[in-house]
Amino acid sequence: VYGTLGDTGVFSELSPYAPNSPYSASKAGADFLVRSCFHTYGMNVVITNCSNNFGPKQHDEKLIPTIIRKALAGEPVPIYGQGTNVRDWLYVVDHCSAIERVFKSGRSGDTYVIGTRNEQKNIDLAYLICDVLDAQSPKSDGGSYRDYISFVTDRPGHDFRYALDPTKIETELDWHPQYLFEDALANTVEWYRKMYQFS
């Protein structure tokens, strides 16, 4: 909902909304609707804005499942542009714990940004996933899954960088992620590898 960042800076609860796609505009619109119900009717609401989620059971067409699925199938792994777009990745289990904390303890009418300060370029993320696959399910020819990475034309409206400052939820609600990114990513790769029936 906040739009895109350049090479520096972070989004916080004080950042203005600046959605750049119909998808993000619909999310911003939902936030405005909820906020208006609080101000008009006193409805007990809280709003959360999160960084990119990952973990088991995510839709197959999302970035991380796509990288895993394509690599295991020996197909080209598509990476938009040069892979320099940056995302702050949030493990789904940590996201759920944050939502629960906000639901139980957040101030009515307030917004809480949920992130982990874990920025990754898409290409670096793809390399990490391929390295995990190399360790968990080595290729029979001894090669690396990195060999399947293929750069494709960037998609329209692709925001360059997202980075969130979770200071408010950390200080006011004492929430912190419980999983290290590398461990959560390895767990995620293993889950998809088993789901796709690659041992």
Predicted regions, residues:
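Catalytic helix-loop patch of NAD(P)-dependent Rossmann-fold dehydrogenases
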Residues: V1-I47, F54, Q58-D60
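C-terminal substrate-binding subdomain of Rossmann-fold SDR/epimerase-dehydratase oxidoreductases
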Residues: P65, A71-S199
